[in-house]
Regions:
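Secretory/exported precursors with cleavable N-terminal leaders
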Residues: 1-181
Length: 181
């Protein structure tokens, strides 16, 4: 647990077994019960990078985190085109190496749309993200120095991050853990 001016962060490292990657879920809990909006508004990439680092490990006293499920879906062709991926969406696209043209009457193919859907579910068994189980949360043992309570009884943010590369895989917030959107 690391404490900051207006929030605290709990890092939950995942057991990685044989995997060389190192994933952690970070729960960012505002000190104020109604402080999530202000926290998100003031959050920058620089603050996130400084906040989501392995800090001093302490024993967690009382730990309460509600079960939650968050999902989102959207169409992404405009975003892909803005990133320079225009050819697959055009009449000049050539998918002949992937699709037998006799199966589609010899017509040329192009991509008309791309849908992206993500979800993350956290419960007492662990975390499931993007239809693949990421692992089970395991608090590793460490030297007893102090104990701090972490009770997420009000809106909070979560970040799922690969710790070696620093890549953020998922990020979202929970306002009402009973809602699935």
């Amino acid at each position: 647990i690391s404490s900051h001016d207006s929030f605290k962060v709990l890092r939950l490292p995942y057991s990685n077994g044989q995997d060389a990657r190192s994933f952690s879920m970070y729960i960012i809990l505002p000190n104020e019960k109604a402080g999530l909006f202000a926290l998100e508004k003031g959050l920058t990439v620089d603050i996130l990078e400084k906040t989501l680092v392995k800090g001093v490990e302490v024993d967690v006293g009382t730990f309460k985190l509600p079960k939650f499920k968050v999902s989102a879906g959207y169409e992404v062709p405009d975003t892909l085109k803005e990133m320079g991926m225009k050819l697959p969406f055009s009449d000049e696209a050539d998918f002949s190496g992937m699709v037998d043209s006799s199966s589609n009457g010899g017509h040329a193919l192009s991509i008309s749309n791309v849908f992206h859907k993500t979800f993350i579910e956290v419960n007492e068994e662990g975390t499931e993200a993007a239809a693949a189980t990421a692992g089970v949360v395991v608090l590793r043992s460490f030297v007893l120095r102090s104990s701090e309570d972490f009770i997420a009884d009000h809106p909070f943010m979560f970040v799922l991050k690969e710790d070696i590369t620093g890549i953020i895989v998922f990020m979202g917030h929970v306002v009402n853990p009973l809602s699935t959107s």
